[in-house]
């Protein structure tokens, strides 16, 4: 598994981008897109140090925002999504979404899991 990005909850993606720009230099930004499979609006930012932030707004993060939680998930890129899913689930992880294509990542497959340290997303390698 290789670190890919941090998922950030937000009510308004444009406002969150403006807030982030006050602290960090953004060197790359995707358009804000709607992913019907996740029922969320999404935008990927790359910061000057290479860190990727996925901004997520919509129903999927409403419960986190109500609790004033901004961090949503950590994403790892994996060679074999089914193999990693099986490994994590056999070590106390709980699958919380189906494996599905993600529009933001050119339809590479993703799956979300709950582990001891929070929510992780597995992203299939290119």
Which residues fall in each region the model found?
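Short secondary-structure boundary/capping segments within folded domains
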Residues: 35, 44-47
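Glyoxalase I/VOC metalloenzyme domain signal
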Residues: 1-4, 8-28, 46-96, 114-126
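Conserved catalytic-core motifs of GNAT/GCN5-like acyltransferases
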Residues: 28-35, 99-103
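Short active-site-proximal "capping" loops at secondary-structure junctions
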Residues: 34-37, 60
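Short acidic/glycine-enriched loop/turn segments that link adjacent beta-strands
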Residues: 36-41, 104-109
């Amino acid at each position: 598994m290789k670190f890919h990005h941090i998922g950030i909850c937000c009510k308004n993606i444009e406002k969150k981008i403006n807030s982030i720009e006050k602290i960090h230099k953004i060197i790359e930004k995707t358009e804000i897109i709607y992913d019907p499979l996740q029922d969320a609006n999404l935008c990927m930012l790359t910061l000057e140090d290479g860190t990727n932030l996925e901004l997520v707004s919509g129903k999927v993060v409403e419960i986190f925002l109500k609790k004033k939680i901004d961090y949503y998930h950590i994403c790892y890129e994996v060679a074999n999504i089914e193999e990693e899913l099986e490994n994590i689930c056999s070590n106390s992880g709980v699958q919380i979404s189906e494996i599905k294509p993600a529009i933001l990542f050119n339809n590479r497959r993703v799956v979300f899991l709950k582990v001891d340290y929070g929510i992780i997303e597995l992203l299939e390698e290119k």
